[in-house]
């Protein structure tokens, strides 16, 4: 498939445009996790968190509600994952989804049905899409651990039309600060719980610990001045929403 944004021809494999088959650093840690047996096991804990917030659809609607309500919207979904919420979007919307995980993209492709959906294997920091092509961009559950979250957000701004909407959501980076054993001076126990009980694995857990102090509101404000930031999911998640400058 030819990409007018960069002038490259990319191969199509199993219905997915392969823009970047090999990744590094944080993105490689994410690939190793989501392509492994750990992800389905961790999904239970994600589901349990959403259950405590009224169910998965109600929880995700706290993010999806900020997308524009317009017909035939062109949506860019960065870190689309398995596309669990695709069925909850209007059927006349077209979606381009990018992710680093082949396993997640394959699951997303199977879920798509008749929706106008194009999938890309690639990184958020280097989106193979044209400038100002989309009406909105969405990213749920990947932003904290992109190789360069600020660069990824600037790429979303580039890809969305002036005046368009960008919606980003994830867990708060310092979520593990809420765990019991950290309060009593035993953070190693909490690390074991996250890695072994919650099934994130050692590499992903190390990454979570490394980025506990990531300044999400600061990144959001630098790239999208005046954007709205709020905590959701009983304080364990966040969403920020902004408009691309005219």
Summary of predicted features, one role per range:
Residues 3:
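Short cysteine-rich clusters marking metal-coordination/redox-active sites
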Residues 14, 18-70, 84-85, 104-107, ...:
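Conserved class I S-adenosyl-L-methionine
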Residues 74-126:
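Class I SAM-dependent methyltransferase SAM/SAH-binding core
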Residues 125-136:
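A short acidic, Gly/Pro-enriched loop at the edge of an enzyme's catalytic core
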Residues 136-148:
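A short SAM/SAH-binding and catalytic strip from SAM-dependent methyltransferases
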Residues 167-238:
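C-terminal alpha-helical "lid/dimerization" subdomain adjacent to the S-adenosyl-L-methionine
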Residues 239-246:
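C-terminal lobe and adjacent flexible extensions of AdoMet/dcAdoMet transferase-like proteins
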